[in-house]
Amino acid sequence: MKKRLAVLLVIVLTITFSFSVTTRIKDIAFFRGARDNQLFGIGLVVGLNGTGDSGNVNSPLLLEMMKKFGVQVSENDLKSKNTALVMVLADIPPFAKEGMRIDCVVASIADAKSLAGGYLLQTPLYGADGKVYAVAQGSVIIGGEDVKLSSNLQKRYRVVGYLPEGAIVERDIPSDMLDGDSVTILLRQPDITTAARVARAINEKFEMDLAKAIDPSAIKLTVPNAFQDDLITFLSLVEEIEVQPDVPARIVVNERTGTVLFGGDVKLSDFVISYGNFTISVTGGKIGDKDATISNLVSALKAAGATPQDIIAILQVIYESGYITGELIIM
């Protein structure tokens, strides 16, 4: 006999979610000009105990690439299994100054088996403009040795390493937030309603029209005369203003892992669906003048023994039929 589920508003959930959470502007946005920049370079890891590159893949092309990036090696240097060609990557933060240290990551380019115990030789790191902004060097840390993983995952993680504070900044990163007498606030998650709320909150805080949302991702902010010579203090006050971001009605499902994530006010229209051993009847109730929600539906399905794959398949059918008010994203 099929199981019948009635998802009504009379269902009382032991856990409730409130989406009217306020947060600081600095947690959802940043100032234009104050962003990370990506650096990259090609280097050589030495000191590997026979787990480096075989030498068969170290073609003249790779040698030329290393010379282009300022690393001088001979073909014989690359034939030993104690060395490995690596790509070196780093994110340099805004306002980084000469002499500061930043973290970097190394990843094998060729057929090395493991970078564990290796040492990265001095490697220049370039920006998108072709200039050297940092130099990396140091011991490679693999980590995760005690974590139980499949053999395939273990092999993958052993050829990617980490150098905490392994690169020294050699050139200041130019960062200019001020454009005339204004700065621009950029939302990390563009949204029309959130942009309008940020502008309104700033204007209410300073009791003057300083901010204006110019599109869903940007708010133009005029620096008042009182702070023309103290921009940092003004921006710090702006960062601490609390706003209520607008959370879109959205469901995200990962078919491979069976994960279901839903946020915002995702609601359901009335429907009846039959799926396998389940018959689901969803009815919007009258209590509190609210509709049936995804939270109610997923909780009821889990209580009835539905697997994550069952839940995902049911959500897909409901969404494609137009009974979900929100966006469904399948990963």
Curated annotation (Swiss-Prot):
InterPro entries: Flag_FlgI (IPR001782). It is found in: Periplasm; Bacterial flagellum basal body. PANTHER family: FLAGELLAR P-RING PERIPLASMIC PROTEIN FLGI, FLAGELLAR P-RING PROTEIN. The basal body constitutes a major portion of the flagellar organelle and consists of four rings (L,P,S, and M) mounted on a central rod. This is Flagellar P-ring protein. Belongs to the FlgI family. It comes from Thermotoga petrophila (strain ATCC BAA-488 / DSM 13995 / JCM 10881 / RKU-1). GO terms for molecular function: structural molecule activity. GO terms for cellular component: bacterial-type flagellum basal body, distal rod, P ring; outer membrane-bounded periplasmic space. Transmembrane segments: none annotated. NCBIfam families: PRK05303.1 (NF003676). Assembles around the rod to form the L-ring and probably protects the motor/basal body from shearing forces during rotation. The lineage of its organism: Bacteria, Thermotogati, Thermotogota, Thermotogae, Thermotogales. Residues 1-25 form the signal peptide. It comes from the Bacteria. Keywords: Bacterial flagellum, Periplasm, Signal. The keyword Signal applies. GO terms for biological process: bacterial-type flagellum-dependent cell motility.
